[in-house]
UniProtKB/Swiss-Prot annotation:
This is Acid ceramidase. It comes from Balaenoptera acutorostrata scammoni. Its main location: other. The gene is ASAH1. Keywords: Disulfide bond, Glycoprotein, Hydrolase, Lipid metabolism, Lysosome, Secreted, Signal, Sphingolipid metabolism, Zymogen. Heterodimer; disulfide-linked. The heterodimer is composed of the disulfide-linked alpha and beta chains produced by autocatalytic cleavage of the precursor. One of its GO terms (molecular function) is fatty acid amide hydrolase activity. The active site is at residue 143. Gene3D superfamilies: Penicillin V Acylase, Chain A.
Length: 395
């Protein structure tokens, strides 16, 4: 009971701090400049590359990666178990995870079932806990995604991956526990078939879905969570109870990256597929005007907001709120991102200036795990681990 009260106090303290601080210095700042190439206190380090060989049986595809990352995965899985046990000390919930979730594996699409079994075998983590690790990305992805088009019609796509809100606050160093534990698990992935790249992505070791990636020469895709009362928790409950006609958002993104052959095909799938959780799909292409934010509920598309440079719309910015609504007053990353893009101007957009925008507080915040920069046409994909030293807002 004491642990639960302490957690409540910490969350309230963080919320009050954010409500007071987000709109005033030093938690906000003027648009950053000259932060690229990454260096200094906001740069944690590079992200390693691994090849995922799609010609291998699904059970074996992740073995090399998971041999390296098993210790870090065990740390975060154990933390999640301890967090669950803090609310249910009997351990029955974790017991149910270990005993019941593997029985649901036959409901997962494509190769994901065998891939998760392979990860469990290599890491010696119970299969139910590997499934839980893959499920919880449906709920806590709070991000900023941007697509820009310069004066020559060249497209860039960038994102901050913010993850881990309310999953434990470390009062000793003012960080989110899960955010910090995800950084050693962050990897760049080159998915290959016949020794040729099919797509590239940034992900977390142990997670077989995708949240950030691109298909060279064709399109780029990122996912942002969309908050809704009829949200991911409801979708997961329905799925567990047997209603399995909706797709997991991380799995549909991977499927699109792996199988779609054009921007328009990807757009159609992301617009029309029934999904487990509401989401924003941020999709970029390789030609002028090929960039959009698809606002989704679980059943249908609510809005498609597209680049239109002839009408002066040379960028789209998506955080975690519908574009026709004001952001939550405790969490306005949209306004500073747009302000910094406008100050940058269309003539000066580049990897360097996009990184500057994503390095400006509160777009950069305590939840930021990594920043990704994507150039579909040139085939460039860069990912950098981030830090946000104090003073820095919690989200």
């Amino acid at each position: 009971m004491l642990g639960r009260s302490r957690l409540t106090f910490v969350l309230l303290s963080v919320t009050v701090t954010c409500s007071v601080a987000q709109h005033v210095p030093p938690w906000t700042e003027d648009c950053r400049k000259s932060t690229y190439p990454p260096s200094g206190p906001t740069y944690r380090g590079p992200v390693p590359w691994y090849t995922i060989n799609l010609d291998l049986p699904p059970y074996k595809r992740w073995h090399e990666l998971m041999v390296d990352k098993a210790p870090a995965l065990k740390v975060i899985v154990n933390y999640l178990k301890n967090m669950i046990n803090a609310f249910e000390p009997s351990g029955k919930i974790v017991q149910l995870v270990d005993q019941k979730l593997p029985g649901l594996l036959g409901s997962f699409p494509g190769p994901f079932e065998e891939e998760m079994k392979g990860i469990a075998a290599v890491t010696e983590i119970p299969l139910g806990e590997i499934i839980l690790f893959n499920i919880f990305y449906e709920f806590f992805t709070i991000c900023t995604s941007i697509i820009t088009e310069d004066k020559e019609g060249h497209l860039l796509h960038a994102r901050n991956m913010d993850f881990g809100v309310f999953l434990g606050w470390n009062v000793n160093n003012n960080t989110w526990v899960v955010t910090e534990e995800l950084k050693p698990l962050t990897v760049n992935l080159d998915f290959q078939r016949n020794s040729k790249t099919v797509f590239k992505a940034a992900g977390f070791a142990g997670y077989v879905g995708m949240l950030t990636g691109f298909k060279p020469g064709l399109f780029s895709l990122t996912l942002n969570e969309r908050f809704s009362t009829n949200g991911g928790f409801m979708g997961v409950i329905e799925w567990i109870l047997g209603k399995k006609d909706a797709k997991w958002i991380g799995f549909i993104i991977r499927s699109v990256l792996e199988n779609s052959t054009s921007y328009e095909e990807a757009k159609t799938i992301l617009t029309k597929s029934k999904i487990l959780a509401p989401a924003y799909f941020i999709l970029g292409g390789s030609k002028s005007g090929e960039g959009c934010v698809i606002t989704r509920d679980r059943v249908q598309s609510l809005d498609i907001y597209e680049l239109d440079p002839k009408q002066g719309i040379w960028y789209v910015v998506q955080t975690n709120y519908d574009r026709w609504k004001n952001p939550f007053f405790l969490d306005n990353r949209r306004t500073p991102a747009k302000m910094c893009l406008n100050r940058t101007t269309q003539e000066n957009i580049s990897f360097a200036t996009m990184y500057d925008v994503l390095s400006t507080k509160p777009v950069l915040n305590k939840l930021t795990v990594y920043t990704a920069l994507i150039d579909v046409t040139k085939g460039q994909f860069e990912t950098y681990l981030r830090d946000c030293p104090d003073p820095c807002i919690g989200w």
